[in-house]
Structure formats: structure tokens, C-alpha cells
Amino acid sequence: MVTLGKADLILVNGQFHTVDRENPVAEAVAVRDGKFLEVGTVAEVMQHHCDGTKVVDLKGHTAIPGLNDSHLHLIRGGLNYNLELRWEGVPSLADALRMLKEQALRTPSPQWVRVVGGWSEFQFAERRMPTLDEINDAAPDTPVFILHLYDRALLNRAALKVVGYTKDTPNPPGGEIQRDANGNPTGMLIARPNAMILYATLAKGPKLPLEQQVNSTRQFMRELNRLGLTSAIDAGGGFQNYPEDYEVIAELHEKKQMTIRIAYNLFTQRPGHELEDFEKWTDMFTPGQGSDFFRHNGAGEMLVFSAADFEDFLEPRPDLAPGMEDELERVVRHLVEHRWPFRLHATYNESISRMLDVFEKVNRDIPFNGLHWFFDHAETVSQANIDRIKALGGGIAVQHRMAFQGEYFAERYGIEATRHTPPVAKMLETGVPVGLGTDATRVASYNPWTALYWLVSGRTVGGMQMYDHSARLDRDTALMLWTQGSAWFSSEQNQKGQIKAGQLADLAVLSKDYFRVPEEEIKGIESVLTVVNGDIVYAAGAFGPLAPPAIPVLPEWSPVVKVPGHYRSAPPQAARVGMSVAHHCSGPCGVHNHQHDFARTSEMPVSDDNAFWGALGCSCFAF
């Protein structure tokens, strides 16, 4: 035990679940210079107290290592976060449409209202998509773009006008512009079979100026901190160009304003010129180059465009191009020669089989020899291919896309086919490294607790039971994959992922005891105190006075001003107390001015503290 080091921060009287088998549970931790100094009993930790030490009493709260999303499009998502209205977790379509209408009134020309990913029609009480008529009624004049998973986008008439889609606009390759009986676009764009039409249309929208992109990225990181996230591996992404789209995150790193650690992969943007991109980048970077907050992590998730098999389960499985292997081999051979780690998007087992043929061929000539590489997604990977991945020393980064698409998958392939899609338990039994993540923001939600709920319960966000007991994970295992497991995918397994002396001091103190609450309550967990590098970056509730200063949202009309991220449901009693304190017009009943007759006939959810208007703090907002 270290007895001489003095701590900068001490947290006591917590239930620290450390993900360290040698010391699985602790009462207290001491932090110095951004790393854990001591993890143990209160008496052991308080030996490191000195006059300058900040001491925080956790009063029995559960604490865990900071969560690490092994596949998040944080850099791209940050640039756009302040532009986007979030429907994540919203319980009814009626509330979602009210949110849309309110934001349309606040959004100035020429800006759009954008709902970009993170939701499913099955999460709504109505269990359906919005109609184009409903969207046009909610926003008759302001352009609206609503992205649903990888399968479709809905545009109102104003958006069709500004993007220029008319009767004479041809369907692009791989996509369809739905038309009415007269051949005019209806506003529905369909990915058939890939999502390029959706992303290309979204890219036509106005961008934020640089100053507001910086603010937007900081807001997104603060939202992730609220959910207990402290690290992410950025998977690049379509229309995320290097170096121009990395200027904002580089500025935040230089100014020491990052509150999420990022390891980033480089994603080629030029079909037919992928090898040229990687030849240039391997001359510029060494894997691991950077700091503990912002470091290079290799190539991917796109290595060659011919290897992309988008997971639109409303459409048949796509077959990859016949020449894919030759193109992929040239890139992988170059990466292995330069000892660059790589990741590759692969949804279907059929794609994975062909990709593994390439990897095995390269390995015979240039041994991988411990090089970290992995598949992303792998929903339908077979046991035979899991064995092949293990033999090559690879891993699998799994995301909760099936929590949003399980119903569609079951409709196409049958409920039995969903039972092990993806087969996470089998991956672990085989000994393959597994890390967990979200693939946010354009498809699934960035909320790690939605993913943990899915893994533990086996249910989608719509409540469909996908997995039986054999395919579900216990809570400790699921947490391990979100912490220590994900660290392998940035080659940082000895630096982060555990509450352990010598590791980076990243942790989250939870609003509820993840290990004991009913399964349905897992998805509502948040952090009440998030620590990154030994610094408190987020605090709420009883720990609110410890929070860093709030960052004003820019621009002032941003959806984040009114809807600050993922839908959050407060405990009923706490919410009602908060409403009556903040708004004297409300009492214990939670109804504005006690106007029960009006409330009973109103369409507004005036007394529901978990509905849209109530979530703003008071039903006054409804009138």
C-alpha cells in the first residue's frame, strides 16, 4: 500500500464496483495527478488526505469505472449535436410531434429541424411511424429532416423544396425517392439497399459556424458525461473528412476542454482511392500517437467501400461486389505492413466469411502477430467465423443496434433467428475480445444504459423479448464489456476500464444501484457525479454544487436549449417536488393552477412529469 502520496481527490462511503477481480468492491478511492492512488477501505484511503485534498462523501451511492463506448461517432455527432432534436426515449409519438412543432417555430430560416437517429417506432405508445401529413402539419414552413435508422428519411414539403427534389429528379444508385401517382416526391426517401441517399440529403443542410461547432461538441460531451461515459473510440464516418472535420476536437484538446477521452480511427472517404488515403495517413501517424485524451487508433471502420454491407433489415441482405476481396487485400496488406490497427464494418456472416478469407491470406504472408484488429457489429456471425477471428487474434465490437431493429429483423428472418443476434455470449465463451458500444448517433441512441438494459434483459426498446436466458448477460459481465472490455479496442487495457491503483481516474457515481434495481429501471440510470482524469466534469442532484459551470448553448434557438439530450424520466415524487418548488402555480397534484377540469379535456400531458411538457419542469409550458 502506498502511504506517502497525497491525494487531490478522495471519494468515501461509496459502493465502488471496480471491475478488478483482485479487489472487486471498495469503500473509497484516492486520486492524484489524474490516476487512482488508492482503492480500498475508508481508513486506507484517508491516509492520503492532506490540507489541499477535496473529499466527497458518496453517502452509499454505487460507483463504477467510467463507461467506454467502443464504437461512437462522437466527432461527427459533436459538430451537429446542437442542430438536432432528440427523440431518444420519448414515450409517445404525440409528444414527439409536439416537440417537432415547437422547435419548428423556434428555428430561423434557412436552418432545418433535424431528428437524426436514436429512436424507433416501437418505442412509442402508438407503435408506429409519424406520417408525412403529420410532419407537414407540425412544420408547414420550416424544413424538416427525420432519419429513422438506416432505412428511411422523412422530409416535409419545405425540405423537399430546399434540397431540390422534384418530379424530374432521378433515383440515385442504391436509393429511392418515393413518389405519388403523378410522379412527384412524397417526402419519403428509402435506403435500397444502402443509406447513401439519406446521408447525402442530410449533408445538404446548413452547418454551424466554427464557434458554435465547438460549443456543440462540448454540449455533446457533457450529455455523455451525464450518462456516465468517460471514453469513446470514434469510428470515423461518412462525410467525416480528415483533417477539416477534426479541427474542432483538436482545438478542444489543445485548450484542455475535452471531458471525454477519444481514440479515433480514420475512415476513407473516396471510393476507388481508399489505398491512397491510407498510404498518406500511414506516413502521417503512428498508432497511439497523441495523449490520454486524444489519440490515433488506426484505420476504419470503412476500409474499402466495396466491403460495406449496410444493416437495413427491411431489405434483403446485400451481396458484396465480386471484386471486393482484391480491393480489401491491398488495403489490409498495407496496414499490416505498417502495424496499423484496423476495424471493419460487417453486419452479416456471409460478408465476414469473405473478409476473413482476405485476412487469412494476408496473415500467411505478413503475420498479424498480435496486431489489434476487429470487426464492428457482426450481428449474424457464426461460431465457425468466431473461431477464425480468435485464431487471427481479432476482436468484435458489438453495439445495441438490435435493440432498435430487432422487430424488423424478426419480421424478415423469424423470431428464432434473433435468439443469438449478435451471439455475444458465444463470443465470450470462445475467448474473443468483446467491447460494447452504441454506433450513435445516426442509428442507435448514444445512451449506454439502453445498451446495458438490452444485454441484461434481452429486450428491444419496444419491449420485444429477443434473447432467452442463455444469450443474455449478467450485470457484472455486461458492465465489464462496457469498461475493461472496450479498452482493448484502443490498446489501453492496462490504462483504463477498472477502478484500480495506477489506472486513469475515470468513474461514474450512479443515480440508482445498477446491480439491484429491477431490469426495467436500468435504462433510466444516469450519473450523478462523473469524474474524468480526477476532475469532476458532471454533477447533479445532491452533488450538484460540485458541478463545473454550465456552458450556455449556442445558437440560442438550438433544440438543446429546450430538449437537452436523451429523454429523462425523473422519479415521480422528486419530479413533483421540483415542480412545486420551481413553479408556485403547481402543487402536489402536479396540475397547473389545479385546473383539473381543463387538464382532463386537454390533449397536453399536463400532469405527467415524465411526458414532454412535464419534463421541462412544469405543465405551464403547455399553455
Labelled PLM ranges:
Residues L79-Y81, G164-T166, S353, E407, ...:
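Short, function-defining helix-loop hinge/capping sites that tune catalysis or transport
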Residues V116, L147, Q399, A508-S511, ...:
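Residue-level recognition of conserved beta-strand edge/terminus positions
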Residues P172-P173, K280-D283, G437, N494:
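Glycine-rich, charged/polar anion/phosphate-binding loops
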Residues L252-K255, T282-F294, I366-F368, I389-G393:
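Acidic (Asp/Glu)-rich catalytic clusters
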Residues A7-D8, G14, E38, E337-H338, ...:
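In a subset of proteins, long, contiguous C-terminal domains/tails are tracked
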Residues R333-R343, T347-W373, H377-A378, Q383-D387, ...:
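His/Asp/Glu-enriched, well-ordered alpha-helical/loop segment
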Residues E274-G288, V398:
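Substrate-binding cleft/loops of secretory-pathway carbohydrate-active enzymes
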Residues V2-V12, H17, R21-K280, R295-S351, ...:
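Divalent metal-binding segments
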